[in-house]
């Protein structure tokens, strides 16, 4: 466990990713007991704690994914918003570290082993002014390391991302910064395991200062270039170096290195994106062997992982810290107050004598400069109408006066305003974490907000809310405690109309199916019985303004009228002339009232006089029906105005 760099430990009743610090107890006695402690630091936090090795486990990507899936599917009461954000940020940092380590390990799997190097000679050895062709042949045929190995050795001390170097910087400054040497010497032709270990130590000795001091942009050598001694003039330096100075170490015996030992120009990037011109002579790549040319075309990425092996842990830690500092906070913390009001926004509104209270904008009428808002309450109905207010009376929820408005509301309704703020905060946290996407009203109606809503609905009687209208223009009920919301009462639909329809169905069956009123109607048509409805019909004008049918259901009325039309046709046209030829009017004004009165008398077992009075009174309407009818008239009048 102590060999692991990152672990997963329990802290504050949660599994947190942490980094194992130095100084952890590793005694053999404790290891046998499995009771030694680990010094760890929570990722993305400065908190350092001690945990038992038995309670910690090596951090893996699978653990992070399991924790993330459990967070997305949790249904319990959410933690504090800031703690939730901190925990999720720590998990994200751990996932980034694991991905980075996985990427570096995959690159190291294809990296060739670092070449062996010889001890470097002082830069004071003067190089020869020219190179003979015989020397080139000897060098090309020597069993020394290949060109690609020397290139890897040359770049192994560079940090990742610094392979592209610039030319044009004076080579004397490069000698001063790097201690007079910028490139490793040639590798020995023969060597065993001891030579390899010695070369590794020597290579680390001269590469460590380079990682600390930083690379000079002019340290990349060009193929076929030599370094002029510092005692020579500037003109000789310019002539010898060409596009930029380079530093090559001479082998033992005072020989100069072949131009094959330098790095190819095609692997070094310039600012202008061009390569320095090559010299056609012993320095020209055209005279290189086929093996060297093939190695010259190998990509630079093969040598990149070597640089990661020589990077100090402090450099890696500094890179991680810079990434953490550059992280942007969640968008919910970077809120800027908008200039206009839109549908779904959270606002403050002052209603009557109560303090400013949070509300949701349901609709906006730009032309009238008004908006419909719905106050956030314990028993808020997301489908409520809300109240119409002027836009200038609204304030954005995150305005500058937010804290003052909260303090004012806490004076009388501390518990209620605290619940409203917690509901809004939970909504914004879920938006930022991506666990919910939608408006606030959709969030309130969804199951994801039930834990927060239940916390107030279970104690709605003891929580004091302001008596806000919630869309109803009525004032608070007289006699109720001031500032306390009345108990919620479910309103059942009115069943009076259905009861009357069932009673009238008996009258229809008596008239149509039983034909109980047919003899009474025939007697009236033949003038055997007097009828006040027939007298009114004959003495009235041609047009009637209103007809009382008594039957409220249209299907029942259609059945009775069709039956009366048949009775009227069977009676003949004797009374049709006196009825001005209007059969429909005769049926509705004479036959329909007489048939219904006869049915009421028979079904209710009352005399004709009582049944006639009941017909004239009409159906008995309930108080609920009268109230609904009055409200419909008011809405119609307001719509016309």
Curated annotation (Swiss-Prot):
For biological process, the GO terms are:
chromatin organization; DNA repair
| Statement: the UniProt record of this protein carries the keyword DNA repair | yes
Example GO molecular function: nucleosome binding
Q: Which residues carry this modification: Phosphoserine?
A: 156, 307
> Where is this protein localized, as stated in its record?
Nucleus
Give the UniProt keywords, A-Z.
DNA damage, DNA repair, Nucleus, Phosphoprotein
Pull one GO CC term from this UniProt entry: nucleus
Which CDD domains does the entry mention?
PWWP_MUM1-like
Keyword Transferase recorded: no
Q: Where is the PWWP domain?
A: 343-404
Biased composition, class Basic and acidic residues, residue ranges: 194-203, 295-307
**Signal peptide coordinates:** none
Residue ranges, annotated region (Disordered): 98-329, 463-486
- SUPFAM superfamilies, alphabetized: Tudor/PWWP/MBT
Q: How does it assemble?
A: Interacts with TP53BP1 (via BRCT domain); the interaction is not dependent on its phosphorylation status. Binds nucleosomes. Interacts with trimethylated 'Lys-36' of histone H3 (H3K36me3) (in vitro).
Report the PANTHER family cross-referenced here. PWWP DOMAIN-CONTAINING DNA REPAIR FACTOR 3 FAMILY MEMBER, PWWP DOMAIN-CONTAINING DNA REPAIR FACTOR 3A
Q: What is known of its domains?
A: The PWWP domain mediates the interaction with nucleosomes.
Q: Which family does it belong to?
A: Belongs to the PWWP3A family.
Q: Give a short account of what the protein does.
A: Involved in the DNA damage response pathway by contributing to the maintenance of chromatin architecture. Recruited to the vicinity of DNA breaks by TP53BP1 and plays an accessory role to facilitate damage-induced chromatin changes and promoting chromatin relaxation. Required for efficient DNA repair and cell survival following DNA damage.
**Stated name of the protein:** PWWP domain-containing DNA repair factor 3A
Q: Which organism is it from?
A: Bos taurus
């Amino acid at each position: 466990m102590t060999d692991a760099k990152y672990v997963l430990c329990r802290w504050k009743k949660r599994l947190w990713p942490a980094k194992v610090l130095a100084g952890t107890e590793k005694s053999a006695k404790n290891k046998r007991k499995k009771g030694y402690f680990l010094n760890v630091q929570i990722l993305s936090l400065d908190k350092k704690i001690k945990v038992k090795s038995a309670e910690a486990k090596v951090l893996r990507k699978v653990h992070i994914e399991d924790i993330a899936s459990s967070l997305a599917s949790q249904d319990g009461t959410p933690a504090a918003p800031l703690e939730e954000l901190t925990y999720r940020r720590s998990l994200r940092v751990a996932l980034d570290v694991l991905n980075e380590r996985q990427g570096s390990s995959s690159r190291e799997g294809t990296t060739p082993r670092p070449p062996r190097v010889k001890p470097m000679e002082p830069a004071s050895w003067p190089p020869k002014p020219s190179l003979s062709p015989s020397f080139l042949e000897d060098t090309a045929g020597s069993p020394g390391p290949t060109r690609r190995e020397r290139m890897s050795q040359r770049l192994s001390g560079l940090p990742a991302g610094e392979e592209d170097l610039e030319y044009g910087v004076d080579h004397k400054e490069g000698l001063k910064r790097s201690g007079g040497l910028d490139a490793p010497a040639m590798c020995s032709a023969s060597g065993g395991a001891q030579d390899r270990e010695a070369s590794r130590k020597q290579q680390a000795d001269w590469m460590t200062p380079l990682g600390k001091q930083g690379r000079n942009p002019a340290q990349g050598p060009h193929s076929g270039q030599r370094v002029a001694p510092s005692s020579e003039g500037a003109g000789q330096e310019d002539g010898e170096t060409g596009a930029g100075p380079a530093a090559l170490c001479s082998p033992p015996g005072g020989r100069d290195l072949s131009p094959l030992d330098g790095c190819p120009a095609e692997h070094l990037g310039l600012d202008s994106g061009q390569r320095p011109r090559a010299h056609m002579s012993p320095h020209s790549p055209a005279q290189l062997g086929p093996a060297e040319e093939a190695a010259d075309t190998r990509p630079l990425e093969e040598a990149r992982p070597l640089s990661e092996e020589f990077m100090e842990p402090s450099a890696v830690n500094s890179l991680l810290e810079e990434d953490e500092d550059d992280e942007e906070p969640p968008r919910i913390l970077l809120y800027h107050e908008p200039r206009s009001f839109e549908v779904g926004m959270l606002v403050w509104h002052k209603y009557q004598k109560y303090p400013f209270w949070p509300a949701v904008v349901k609709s906006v009428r730009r032309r009238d400069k008004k908006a419909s808002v719905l106050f956030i309450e314990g028993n808020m109905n997301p489908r409520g109408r809300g109240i119409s207010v002027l836009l200038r009376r609204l304030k954005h929820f995150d305005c500058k006066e937010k804290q003052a408005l909260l303090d004012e509301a806490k004076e009388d309704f501390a518990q209620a305003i605290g619940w409203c703020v917690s509901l809004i905060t939970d909504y914004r946290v879920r938006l930022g974490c991506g666990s919910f996407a939608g408006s606030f009203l959709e969030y309130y109606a969804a199951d994801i907000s039930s834990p927060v809503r239940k916390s107030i609905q279970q104690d709605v009687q003891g929580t004091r809310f302001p008596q806000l209208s919630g869309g109803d223009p009525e004032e608070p009920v007289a006699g109720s405690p001031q500032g306390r919301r009345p108990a919620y009462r479910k309103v059942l639909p009115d069943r009076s109309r259905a009861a009357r329809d069932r009673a009238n169905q008996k009258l229809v069956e008596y008239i149509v199916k039983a034909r109980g009123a047919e003899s009474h109607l025939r007697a009236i048509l033949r003038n055997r019985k007097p009828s006040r409805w027939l007298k009114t019909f004959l003495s009235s004008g041609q047009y009637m303004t209103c007809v009382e049918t008594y039957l409220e259901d249209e299907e029942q009325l259609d059945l009775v009228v069709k039956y009366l039309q048949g009775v009227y046709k069977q009676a003949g046209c004797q009374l049709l002339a006196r009825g001005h030829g209007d059969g429909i009017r005769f049926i509705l004004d004479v036959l329909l009232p007489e048939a219904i009165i006869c049915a009421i008398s028979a079904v209710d077992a009352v005399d004709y006089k009582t049944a006639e009075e009941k017909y004239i009174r009409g159906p008995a309407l309930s108080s609920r029906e009268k109230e609904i009818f009055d409200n419909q008239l008011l809405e119609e009048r307001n719509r016309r105005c």
